[in-house]
Amino acid sequence: MMPTQIGDSVILDVTPERDDFGRMAAIQAKQVLAQKLRDQQRKIIQEEFEQFEGSSLTGKVLRFERQSVILAVNSSFGQPDVEAELPQQEQLPNDNYRIGRTFKVFLKKVREGSQRGPQLLVSRGSAGLVVELFANEVPEIEEELVRIVAVAREASPPSRHVGPRTKIAVDTLEGDVDPVGACIGARGSRIQVVVNELQGEKIDVIRWSPDPSTYISNALSPARIDEVRLVNPDGRQAHVLVPEDQLSLAIGKEGQNVRLAARLTGWKIDIKDAAKYDPIAAMAEVESQRQAESEYQSRYRPDYQDAGSVDEE
């Protein structure tokens, strides 16, 4: 071979050995096929479970990843068990997650097939799970004789000294049907199934009413209410008068009962001692609060008008 110099062209044979080339091609082909198979499986899972978003499923604990519980959910397409993720914030404090144990879960979302990890995002703390559990246990709900109007749930209370609790408001259009009794069942048989599934969570089933005073009074169950005053209907603010011996029950441990009642009804609820209530002073306080809120809004409300726009006459 002639000696090469700077600027010369050199031709080299870089053809791989036949065996090496065949092995590399086989590995690449296998990887491509495996990826396509995984993509197709995830697409099938997505198509199957999207229709079940907002409903309950049964999952079996497979393993733990970081602070999430990975569950196996049955697939109706003959696929292997589909994995679902139960994040820490969706877990119940009273649950004991052990490998092989089964739980009812609420399917919140089916993730896109292109994403990594479990495609199903499930919850044990969603109010939707309570609705689904009652729907499964109460035939009158399935038959649309009883309807669930509202649910307020505190599955993970801010304090460990307070347990999970749910308030559920029910109603019926049938005069001969007791919606509360239908949900509770004979000797509490129906509601007990739901309570057991939620590991002893306290559940209050109350009667919904179109009358705000009655609805608020029912929502504060089991406390005995003397009077409900709608002191600011536009602002949905109410004063609830109770006997002194009912104050702690109406408010609840660390305010949980009144907090859930407010969320259930959509009203701001102030619990007052009936014996010490001064209606004139109370209304003056409400009016003062209303004026303060109005001044705050007028002072700090941003001006959304576009400086470049022209008002039409």
What function would you assign to each model-found segment?
Residues 1-313:
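RNA-contacting regions in translation and RNA-metabolism proteins
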